[in-house]
Each structure stands twice: as C-alpha cells, then as structure tokens.
Amino acid sequence: MVTVYSKNNCMQCKMVKKWLSEHEIAFDEINIDEQPEFVEKVIEMGFRAAPVITKDDFAFSGFRPSELAKLA
C-alpha cells in the first residue's frame, strides 16, 4: 500500500494525491499537521519536507511523476 505523508496548505501534497487518484493508485494519507506523532517517523526516514511517499522499502519526497509511476 502506498502511504502519502502530507501537510496542510501543501501544493505538492495536493498534486501527488491528485496524480495518484487520476492513475487509480490506492493510497493512505497521513497528515502530519493533524497527526504530529508521525513527524519523527518522517525524519527518521531521512526526509525534512512534505510530501513523502512510501511503498514497502521505496520512499521519496516531492511531486515526481516519474517516481510516482513506479508505484503502479
């Protein structure tokens, strides 16, 4: 399952979620503004900015369509 760690008022987060929906890729969203207990997990994965997208051992940050396509 794909997980998107997002934040409020984050344009790249919105773009990632829209791209995944348009390509019919199911995902869970964790909003780290609303669920701050996940901030430490994101930092431990080596990321400092949202969105962070994960699937199994694959993780990346930002709106990157070429990487998003690998999630299908």
UniProtKB/Swiss-Prot annotation:
Disulfide bonds join 10-13. The keyword Electron transport applies. Transmembrane segments: none annotated. It comes from the Bacteria. GO terms for biological process: cell redox homeostasis. The keyword Secreted does not apply. InterPro entries: GlrX_NrdH, Glutaredoxin, Grx-like_ET, Thioredoxin-like_sf. GO terms for molecular function: electron transfer activity. Keywords: Disulfide bond, Electron transport, Redox-active center, Transport. It holds the Pfam family Glutaredoxin. Residues 1-72 form the Glutaredoxin domain. Belongs to the glutaredoxin family. Electron transport system for the ribonucleotide reductase system NrdEF. This is Glutaredoxin-like protein NrdH.
